């Protein structure tokens, strides 16, 4: 049986390494063609666009961490509204570009009053989660103060308090890419 850490290592790290190698090779090969006078001028101009596309992909977090991007989940599986019982913090998200009734799903690290050693422990059992409905162009997020946690495997850093959310597009089943809001508490 695979646990979440094994899935993370096997799928995500392999994906990150593969994409990094492909993008690195693309940029190096394109630079070689661009800087070599033996190649046709049209090809050399074309590789400028290839380099630009590779750089744009490198700058997007979803390129390396695809689970943060657009995804699909049948909207009937998402509760209408849910607030963590006893949540004591409230944040308002401007959703004026979305119609009233649009749902957002949100989640934050658990509250333990300690720095948590890894993301899997930080979100364990997903106790600090909810679903909010847009009303008058705003969505209210109610959570407990999330703890800071460490990400040691890739970035080796301490992440400050924050919560994530996705917008639910009911008609299509799409969920927006993950968005993050920093929290002061």
Briefly describe each language-model feature range:
Residues 2-9, 30-33, 43-46, 55-185:
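Beta-strand-dominated extracellular/periplasmic modules and repeats
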Residues 25, 49-56:
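Hydrophobic cores of alpha-helical transmembrane segments in multi-pass integral membrane proteins
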Residues 23-36:
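N-terminal signal sequences
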């Amino acid at each position: 049986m695979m646990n979440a850490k094994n899935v993370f290592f096997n799928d995500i790290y392999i994906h990150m390494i593969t994409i990094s190698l492909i993008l690195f090779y693309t940029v190096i090969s394109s630079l070689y063609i661009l800087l070599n006078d033996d190649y046709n001028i049209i090809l050399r101009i074309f590789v400028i666009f290839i380099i630009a596309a590779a750089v744009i992909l490198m700058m997007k977090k979803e390129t390396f961490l695809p689970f943060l991007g657009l995804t699909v989940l049948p909207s009937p599986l998402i509760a209408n509204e849910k607030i963590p019982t006893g949540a004591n913090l409230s944040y308002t998200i401007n959703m004026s570009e979305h119609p009233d009734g649009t749902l957002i799903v949100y989640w934050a690290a658990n509250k333990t009053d300690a720095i948590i050693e890894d993301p899997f422990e930080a979100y364990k059992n997903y106790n600090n989660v909810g679903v909010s409905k847009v009303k008058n162009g705003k969505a209210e997020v109610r959570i407990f103060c999330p703890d800071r946690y460490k990400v040691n495997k890739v970035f080796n850093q301490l992440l400050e308090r924050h919560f994530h959310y996705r917008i639910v597009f009911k008609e299509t089943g799409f969920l927006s890419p993950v968005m993050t809001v920093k929290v002061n508490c």
